[in-house]
């Protein structure tokens, strides 16, 4: 029996002993069918307690660790561990997979939870971030994911009463989650003082936002919202592991072994202590509880499951037991009864009944048990222990007979001899000890040759010999009982063995794979009766082999279930069962053995899913006599589709070469040529490695592919239309059921599939991201909605797509060998079949994955390589064509029968309504009936059958057929030789198209006089083609060797051909018969050329580095050109026939003289003057520009110059054909490039009249014919030179505003940094010095004076409880655009500033706010579709910024989109239907993303441009077309499925137009697009071509454009001086031909508009300076609605001492006075310098302002006239104050000084004193109430007090304590230590202000937060309330005079916020 076939018998899993209780929780439930579901190892178990039966789910491939029950109580979700863990959802009735969720988690899936309606599933990963995911599990789609927590999460649960809310808990945390859009956001639970912060182990949600959770200390923590409201103490005395909620209430289970039941309000009902019951024991710990009606389930840490009936709660039933934690190795079966014994590291020995599936006895030992053995009569049991001792027990009462310890190391193997007289014990020390049973186990022998630990031992039948295996892989023999080694081979050979459990030896060598030395098979056991062997290995597999199993790499059957290591396998005494034990999963599996007679070659009727019963992957074949592969198939499997460089790598290469060569001075690059090319016709069809790639379209055209082109061929006109969307070889093609769309798949690193329309040739969808190397098979589903594709990666992945959306529905690994065909089931959209090398599999989609079953051959046939497959008309029939020529007929997965159809493989099959047509390697087409019972007709493809209308010749009779299709009364056939034929049903055949066969094509020559060319290829043929409208092959000749070059003689009569073996021939050009041949060289001939005119000489270049010159007339070699150091690549003659130009592989350009071959050195300048007959060389100064920047990778293979010397065509290794203007001097000339060939373009030639260019591709075998389009006649639809967009020289224009905006770097709050450069220790980190004179606690002294003067003593002291945002002055115009809109027919406007979205009512002026953003908002858009009224989208700066979509009226968030745009989102826009949203980021790639915002799904995403993109807008009538503009950037985008395709704007030859920086977009009818440029022009585009310019629409940049949807009028806004005719806002007609200008009355010299919006008769305008203005269209009157500061930080802020007014002073050089009550600007003054601080005088008459340049001014409030000014300092004035008695002015500066001025002396402002000893710059100053002191806070975090006006520092604490301050704005001092947060290391508290009532202090900080504290605030980290709105820095803050308002100013956001105090 030396065959390697798999055995015909099988195993079926019958029972699993065990339950996983350790490291898991909440994994035990009742199903709807009252069964119990749980898991153990890698198996999901459904246990029916009534019938005592188990069902198994085997879809996992590693340990299951989590389980959730669907609300319908039937579906189960399980999650596993592993490198790529997945989640299965399965049905507990039939244990079938319903859905698979994969490709997201790593390490493992720790928790699972279904939501209350069962639609969504939440999962938590075991990765470092404990990722939380939300799935639409039926679709297998990930909806959202987020970082869970930094530490383990133990439980997650949905809130059943609130949609989209979840709670998770774990190590020291609990989090409350909200799902909105695709954003999953968490808020941490607040433990507060109610309970200790501790680990929460489990939770359940209840009504009214209550959450119950079980804590580590045994308490129940009860939460309301986020806050811990109470604890139920001592619910358990130790950790609560499980909390179960049901209708009746709650059940909890804990580490204390108790179950407690609680009612729905969590009042206790009862308590059950399992430790106290009769099966209980000390240390019992409950991991899982479930309560259903009157029954409870409890799962314990030690793998037991208890069932308790509540009425009889003192009698729990133990319904399942298994071993506890610890490895399980020991297994033995009783020699006479169906009993098994196991022993484990849990120190127990257990006896199991195999017949009853029950534990009958358990015995606890002192030590871990590692091996067991029954004596032959079954009376005694020996146990080997971990400490090296062994124990013998009597079986009947489990009492000890002996306990012997002779060894130190663990005993891993022991066996009694068959006669019962000896016990052999093998230990890890190495020896085997032999003991005599009868002599009370006296040691009588020792076998000690092993150098390593003993793994297995077996006795001979007669008990005289022992064989051992050890850890070193040695197999040794000993005589018994002495232990003498036995070496004689003969003697060993004859020994019959009593048992076979050894893994080494000739009988079991087949269990080891070929060519490996592995040690991962732990155990085997032979069944002599049935000649089978069972094995268990480290991969969790149990396998069946034939026994004996002699040849390595034998086939087997394999069974899954154990997770990691199967430690032991044994047959039962009667061979009915196999038992296997799992190491880490410590479970025991009992398998039923189904002998061959029973299984009778037919697989079980219900093969288990997940390929559980499978023939193993590795052992695909059942038989060893697999025929060798057919040569064609063999050849095909060897093809390698890897590329050194993929097209996708080009941008990177360009980038790298840019970085390397950036030092090169930028010379003017040569211009691209005016003329262009159009691909007209391609000769070729890819048949040699593709199949089923030929179809009729709806219109009766033929569609197929060659190279990177899909061809739609018209039979009547013999013309081709070409789809050129691919950039590398197409490998597969399929047609939509309606026959109008086609899908094609290509080669690539990330291989793409295009779905395109055969009429328009437009790409409808581009599918990427899931295949590597290439896509080798495609098929549409029967309804045409889905597409399935198969990749060329190592696993041949299968991907199922919703192709219109471009989303993958499901994926799976296909097979390890190549898959040739995939087919969708016509009746069931979710079923597929694949065939390939030794493979047929039937697939069923399950959620995001597939389950598969292999074809089961039974006795009807055997496993073959399948080449084609088709579904029949009857429901479950499948027909597959095999490599043997047979057709296999399948029903479901069973093979019914086979039918012989062809000689050699059946490559093609096509199903008809009533039958099939097949084609094979034998070149015969056969028509069959619908069950392959009769062959109705055959057609042999022969030359004699060809009709006269054929467009070519058959290369040979009976070519191998690779594709067949029927339609239009014909059979269409594609052959391996690259021919396409149409067979009429009556017999005649027409050849439509043909090309070269497999092999590279290099040789190409154009006829000197006629439209004819010749090609020669490695396929060993020379072919002559006609190029007129006939496009056909005229002649073909087979050669003995492949050829690489050919050339016509000048008269066109002779044709020279150079071959690969160093020979060449000259043939007659008409008959292609030999004229002469030579063989002078060994290496291949690389180029061959006749000299001009008479063609006297023939030059022959070879890879031997020589060029031979022959005299044609005498047929002799006359000269040899030597001197090249490498192989010759190209040669050209000069026009006199005297000089040869030669290029070599070492990039040498050499010159030789004919006929002798003398070498000449010619200077470049001279060489340029020589007139050459032909130019095919690629070197020299006139070609320098054709080499690309990254030419170290790519080579230019060929070039050819037109006869007039103007146009040079080249072909390169990237598949590009390029046109250059000749001469091509200087580096990197511009060009036009064309795609079509796939990898290498090997040769290019112009036809004799220069009107046509011919190109051949190397491996793609194609001959392409391009027509030259002269400048005038061009169709302008050209892909122009790609390179030109990167040129530095054409900069896109300049404007200071745009330049500044480009340079803004958006950093975020996350990196919050101090806005001031402070130094020193933060106040809350300073150590306090204890002063000597601390007052005694009870002081007899007078009471301390107030800290703060109370201004309004009369009123009741009012405490401020809350702040509410009331109004914002500001609008972000300086770096945003189009961020201002009308709402509600012009009643409201919406805009943004800082982090606030603002809706302002125009009639009342009141504002409402959207404050959910966490940082500056950068963009805002309003949905224009009536269905989504008032829906607004905004987005922001941030490392992971979110887009918020919200309702402008209610301010409800409708959806949140977490983005990939790092740094921020700077533009968003809704599509025409309002359902899609496009966003663009400020990340380095400027990614453009399209979203389906309501679901929160990303539709597509792609890098937009390397520089800033300013605007991206959908066409107002489209959901797929949009336009982006930016820095030198103009792209027209199409959304195709889930891919974004773009066309660059083509400027063409318009005068005065060049690619500018574009700033804005508007749209017109008929596909018109208008873009505003930086120079003030508006460019008008039709499709993507520029058609005209609106010159100088504005004098400066056109920043904004608005298209009015209702009448199509366009508003533009830009930078312009207001004049009579011109203005910064203009209203245009629909075509932008006429306009009307509006002046904005802002008083600025140049107005700069950033945003416009048109309402009814009004235009809303936003300016760069932060104003919002409304302009009437009729009256042209402008009305300022919002006034804000311009760009620049606002630092100065002061509130009026008695009125509701305040002043703000900003770096924009203005000071503005505002009215708090009416919310409006009262007055403003331009100061001429940036202002830093401001202060009112106590009487409110004057205001002092300090400037950044050291100057200060005093203005009169009413007139804002200057009262006085002074400049005594050079650096910024930081704070300024007027004393309460109106006498002194204090001025604090950056020069570490405070200067005092006496105001009573009039406007001279003489300094009367100043403070010295200030350690750093001044930040805040406050006067005392009596004007005698001033407190100064400084940049060194120190506060000092000085006398006024002398400036002397006050150091006595006593004095300072007693001062009453007039105001408090200091952030320093003990009184305010509590305002400093813990996380202030990067950021500071900038400002503070205490209320006039002295009870509260409000602060502003670098995080943009306002915080409200009580005052004084002397405890560190005091409690506070926080308010958002500002973006990064709050610079200053003040209470109004009566504490009604707080005013705060922003740093970066240039906004003033007014808050109401409540």
UniProtKB/Swiss-Prot annotation:
Primary site of residence: cytoplasm
Segments passing through the bilayer: none
InterPro entries listed in its UniProt record: Beta-prop_EML-like_2nd (IPR055442), Beta-prop_EML_1st (IPR055439), HELP (IPR005108), Quinoprotein_ADH-like_sf (IPR011047), WD40/YVTN_repeat-like_dom_sf (IPR015943), WD40_repeat_dom_sf (IPR036322), WD40_rpt (IPR001680), WD_repeat_EMAP (IPR050630)
Protein's UniProt keywords contain Cytoplasm: yes
Keywords in alphabetical order: Cytoplasm, Cytoskeleton, Microtubule, Repeat, WD repeat
Residue numbers spanned by region Disordered: 604-627, 1322-1352
GO cellular component, one term: cytoplasm
Basic and acidic residues biased stretches: 1322-1337
Gene3D superfamilies: YVTN repeat-like/Quinoprotein amine dehydrogenase (2.130.10.10)
Protein localization: Cytoplasm, Cytoskeleton
WD repeat locations: 59-100, 104-145, 148-187, 195-233, 235-273, 280-321, 323-362, 364-403, 406-445, 561-601, 725-766, 770-811, 814-853, 861-900, 901-940, 996-1035, 1038-1077, 1080-1120, 1191-1230, 1236-1276, 1412-1456, 1460-1501, 1504-1543, 1553-1591, 1593-1638, 1685-1724, 1726-1767, 1768-1807, 1880-1919, 1925-1958
Biased composition range(s): Acidic residues: 615-627
Family as reported in the entry's similarity comment: Belongs to the WD repeat EMAP family.
Function (record text): May modify the assembly dynamics of microtubules, such that microtubules are slightly longer, but more dynamic.
PANTHER family found in the cross-reference section: ECHINODERM MICROTUBULE-ASSOCIATED PROTEIN-LIKE 6, WD-40 REPEAT PROTEIN
Identification of the protein by name: Echinoderm microtubule-associated protein-like 6
Organism of origin: Mus musculus (Mouse)
Lineage: Eukaryota, Metazoa, Chordata, Craniata, Vertebrata
